[in-house]
Amino acid sequence: MLDSIRLQNFKTHRDTEIKLGRLTVLVGPNGSGKSSVLQAIELLRQPAKRSAYKSIARHGEVVGECEIQIAGHHANGKPWSRTSIDAPLMGSWVGNRPDLDPTQAGTKEFDASLQAVLLMPDPESMAAPVRITDVSPQLHRSGWGLADVVATMRDNDDDSFQALQDALRAVVPQVERVKVQRQLITEDFSKYVAYRLLFDVAGRKDIPASTMSGGTLLALAILALLHSPQRPRILLLDDIDHGLHPKAQWDLLKQLRRLLERFPDLQIVATSHSPDLVDELDPSEVIVLTLREDGTSAAKSLTECPREDMLGVLKAGQLWSAIGEDWVKADHRVSYRDRRAHRPPTLSTISASHVQDP
């Protein structure tokens, strides 16, 4: 399990350290560096490649050495730490670092701890038919391959397939059944057989995945990945609330918590823009990011917010909405009294619409 990650000169992150728990949700404005944290973790799980550095430089500048440091612990509680990437951003490739590939360094436990999958789903990709091959099914970053993953689960593990459908119905009650059919595809003078996702929804049969909402497909992709035999130890979810009604967001979070309880080695790191979803989190599970005036990322736990009087009174999403992100830019050494100069809203200035009964 990962306990922390530190990014230096990685995209907008000049020097950012983030503590990670079993469930960590990153929030903040667009472009504040949330997705970059997920991408950095994903980069650790595979041998470093030259092409991986094409998108790292910030604004095309030479910003020095890029370094990603991680720390965690094994299942037996033994801690570990490692500097995983250390290469000039715009210079020549450094190819003599065995720690760039954990398997080459001979640390199998370390490699297992970084079984991470990044999901940045695209509705069109998730709905796409998937050509049937002998290759083991794999859910790609965009969600492509979902039909193959579901078909394999249906054919080889009926219990998991039924559990998947039950979990999806808990999030999207209108879905009565998930189906996978074979379909002959004609494309550029060639033909092949593909798996195609269909849904029974509210009494209607065989609704194509292409007509389903992106939120439904997202929920299916997340739950299929976590119910499959290929379940990763670390699931990285970009925009976990995308296309989901607030109640569906809460219900999806409930399913994720059940899976975290069921699988002690599972860890989830996600990004979100939804105060409704954040309302169902503990402040310790929320990391707030923003950009400083110089364009670099700043990050702090919501538990570090300057309004201690609001902690424990407002839900996490309400607290985030009330105080915003500017406080994250403040130096850790600035006192609470000094931070009051920012004059965040008091409880009396928060409208009743922001406060819900617990």
Regions found by a protein language model. Give the residues of each.
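Pre-Walker A-like glycine/lysine-rich segment at the N-terminus of P-loop NTPase domains
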Residues: M1-P47, Y53-E65
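The start of beta-strands in P-loop NTPase/AAA+ ATPase cores
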Residues: R233-I234
